[in-house]
Design a protein with these regions (language model features):
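Catalytic centers of hydrolytic enzymes
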Residues: 1-220
């Protein structure tokens, strides 16, 4: 047949009057599960921004896989903040709910830049969070959300060797939505949420208050 008309509307499920008791009970049972309430670590200070959580995730990816550089897309961090105090299994699954797998890549500095810029389409809003390095970002003068160029630096502020190859770890979403050299990626049999849990259980206490690995440079 032929579609002659169509209509769609948004429904605010939080205000939707109808409920299904069976579904409500299933959700309550799931949310009250001791498995989800298990404490992994304690946040010594609050995580006050999505980037701060992303930096912690990058560090977790690096520590568990032995990679030199960690990268996480902003959309891969699904909560905006987390208070000081306990971090539970449920918190991690809310932070990273996608069943993503870790991917290790062997990339030069230039290839890392190309991967990140093709992923975010040169926009600051979607620029990934990082671990093991910092990023100096210069924006276009006429389009302040558009990235003109980025410089990768080591954690002690030295310029990264852009021709050297580095072991990079990310989730499977970034390589699937960016440009990378053929055959440079290797998917691990490790879910990223499990990696974060391993990291937190090992650390016991974490503090990332004020951590940022992106610096916006003024136009010269």
């Amino acid at each position: 047949g032929k579609v002659v008309d169509k209509k769609a509307e948004y429904i605010d499920v939080r205000k939707y009057p109808k409920t299904v008791k069976v579904v409500e009970e299933m959700a309550r049972f799931y949310n009250d599960s001791p498995t989800l309430r298990r404490i992994l670590a304690s946040a010594d200070t609050p995580f006050e921004a999505r980037e701060v959580l992303g930096c912690m995730m990058c560090d977790a990816f690096m520590e568990v896989t032995g990679a030199e550089i960690g990268i996480v897309n902003p959309g891969g961090v699904r909560i905006e903040s987390h208070p000081q105090g306990d971090i539970t299994v449920r918190d991690v699954l809310e932070m990273d709910p996608f069943d993503n797998h870790a991917v290790v890549l062997e990339l030069t500095g230039n290839e890392i830049v190309h991967m990140m810029l093709t992923y975010c389409h040169n926009t600051l809003h979607s620029f990934p969070y990082v671990g093991g390095i910092t990023c100096e970002i210069t924006l276009e003068e006429d389009f302040p959300e558009k990235i003109k160029c980025i410089k990768l630096l080591t954690l002690d502020g030295k310029k990264l060797n852009m021709k050297k190859k580095y072991k990079v770890v990310t989730n499977n979403y970034i390589p699937a939505t960016s440009e990378i050299p053929e055959g440079s990626d290797h998917i691990l049999n490790l879910e990223t949420s499990d990696i974060i849990m391993q990291f937190l259980e090992k650390k016991k206490v974490v503090s990332y208050q004020g951590v940022s690995r992106q610096k916006i440079r003024p136009l010269e």
